[in-house]
């Protein structure tokens, strides 16, 4: 007999889901998709740059990145275990407020602290060239999709792009706070 777990009056929604992998074409590129990657233990990846940029990232979003070497990193240059542990305070951070039926609902995609409040699907995509990595979370309750991608540019260096999509036919009022955190000041060694 399986009983629901509650946090206050909110039932947590965290049934285990099967991890699946597949190739697909997206945005003119070929990607490998890992569906429900959050069910796996965090794993480490690197992105390939055509110049002197580098980026090491965990599947939970924690990362370090920079140019040339560790002494010119944008984020603290730590060992992989510390990068994995630091995902909540280093790298991408998104907080979304949705006005729905006179309620203001808070959603923080990819955060371990918000897991179970909503029914979600999480997918990870890495292109076959190894220079693009996309995180995607679909909130089935709010009918919203949020995704962000890391890549490189000769002109701009390390890039992060983000998207939000309304999957419902109903118009929504959404407030979104998005950015990166724990950036090192220029000239500070790690």
Which residues does each predicted region cover?
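Anionic coordination/interaction segments
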Residues: 1-190
């Amino acid at each position: 007999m399986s009983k629901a777990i509650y946090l206050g009056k909110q039932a947590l929604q965290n049934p285990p889901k099967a991890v699946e992998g597949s190739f697909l074409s997206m945005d003119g590129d070929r990607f490998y998709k890992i569906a429900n990657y959050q069910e796996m233990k965090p794993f480490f990846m690197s992105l390939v740059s055509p110049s002197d940029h580098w980026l090491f990232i965990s599947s939970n979003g924690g990362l370090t990145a920079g140019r040339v070497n560790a002494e010119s990193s944008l984020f603290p240059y730590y060992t992989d275990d510390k990068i994995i542990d630091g995902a909540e305070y280093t790298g991408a951070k998104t907080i979304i407020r949705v006005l729905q039926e006179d309620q203001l609902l808070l959603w923080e995609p990819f955060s371990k602290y918000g897991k179970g409040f909503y029914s979600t699907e999480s997918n990870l995509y890495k292109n076959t060239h190894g220079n693009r990595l996309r995180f995607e979370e679909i909130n089935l309750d709010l009918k919203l999709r949020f995704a962000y991608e890391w890549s490189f540019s000769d002109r701009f260096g390390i890039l992060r792009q983000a998207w939000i999509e309304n999957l419902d036919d109903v118009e929504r009022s959404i407030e979104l706070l998005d950015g990166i955190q724990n950036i090192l000041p220029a000239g500070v060694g790690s």
